[in-house]
Amino acid sequence: MPASACLRWAETISCQYPLLRAHAARHGPLSLVHLDAHSDSWTSEDYNHGTMFYHAIREGLVDAAHSIQVGIRTPNPETHGLTILDARWLLDQGPRAAAERIRSVVGSRPAYLTLDIDFLDPAYAPGTGTPVVGGPTTQQARELLLGLRGVNLVGGDQVEVAPAYDALGQITALAGATLAADILYLIGLARAERGAAV
């Protein structure tokens, strides 16, 4: 039976580890495209939202040499071999340049895209547990995502929308739903380009 497309939409970032494990079992080590204010790659034996990608790299689920983190505003000195484009780089160079850099790092390898809603500046997504000022707008995030057409995405997620913290008008939920739809579009497009059922 052919594998189906999967986009995970969750409040907590800890859902990513089992998803990475499942996708890596099918496709081999993944190129990670991680859009977030936080690196989530701190070195620790604990498995939690701050160590997820450290463990994924250490266990061979993620190929760090062909993976990239974008929008980071709480830097971690331990890069574990990941390419890092911090928020200053993103805002100076723009979303199109970031998309091109992602494409050059990932190449044609199977890729997993994860977007933490705190990637956005809290002016556009206040409803999250750990907001950090200085991020991109919703439109800049969409421009970056749509610049990833042709990347071999095999899965993805959009995490950390916390409705209890959202502003009047549910702007975080709207941003999260819109970006999740964009990611799903990219996964479907990649499946079609591979000749898989969409």
Q: PLM ranges: what are they?
A:
Residues 1-198:
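Conserved alpha-helical scaffold segments that buttress catalytic/binding sites
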